[in-house]
Amino acid sequence: MKKYLILFLTLILSGCSVVRINTNNLDTIIDVVLSKNNSLYNRDGRGYKYYIPNGVTHIDTDDLTHTLYYNGEYLYLYVDIVSYYYNKDIKFKKNDYAYYSRKLNLDNKKKKGYVEVIKKDDLYYVNFYYNYARIEALVTEEDLNNTILNATYILSTIKYNKGLIKTMLDDEYLINKAGKYDLFKINDKTEKFILQKDKEGEWLWSF
């Protein structure tokens, strides 16, 4: 039986209607959420603000990286205000070996991005880039679709303060930090991951 998730946009997003999303279909999840004009926010960052849905918890902020938590899984959000300010274009090549690989370029949106999901052992590595921000996670198959749903909400609600960012770009510290956490490089080979295993077989983040 297909699972359906009822999304109350009155409380969560635009306040227009109740939408049912087939959560077995990643394309549908992404397309429906990105088709809305999401304007709510409940978190502030340095030069931007964004919204995290009910059930997602903000754990910590380390410079430009935000650690989020949902249903036993961690999501890592990085917002690239430098790329936003300079309107940096993205390069993406569809990965035919990935579990899911798709470029995002909706006709009615100026924002661009991509989603890539790669299966590693019994887990799924999610690499979701949209609106000059990235969410990464390593999740179980059971949590994959809800992770994509939450990531789509979060990335689509990011709003930038260009004036404040311009002031911040004069800060050498910020530029150094942006370089340190330069996660916005597309990997041409499937074996390259930001997530790596250590000698004991534990997953570690490489940044």
Language-model regions, residue ranges each:
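Surface-exposed amphipathic alpha-helical segments
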Residues: 137-207
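Sec-dependent N-terminal signal peptides
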Residues: 6-9
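C-terminal motif of bacterial Sec signal peptides marking the signal peptidase cleavage site
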Residues: 14-15
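N-terminal "mature-domain start" segment
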Residues: 23-64
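Short, conserved catalytic or interaction motifs in soluble domains
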Residues: 18
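Conserved polar/disulfide-associated segments of primarily extracytoplasmic proteins
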Residues: 60-147
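Positively charged n-region of N-terminal signal peptides that target proteins for export
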Residues: 1-4
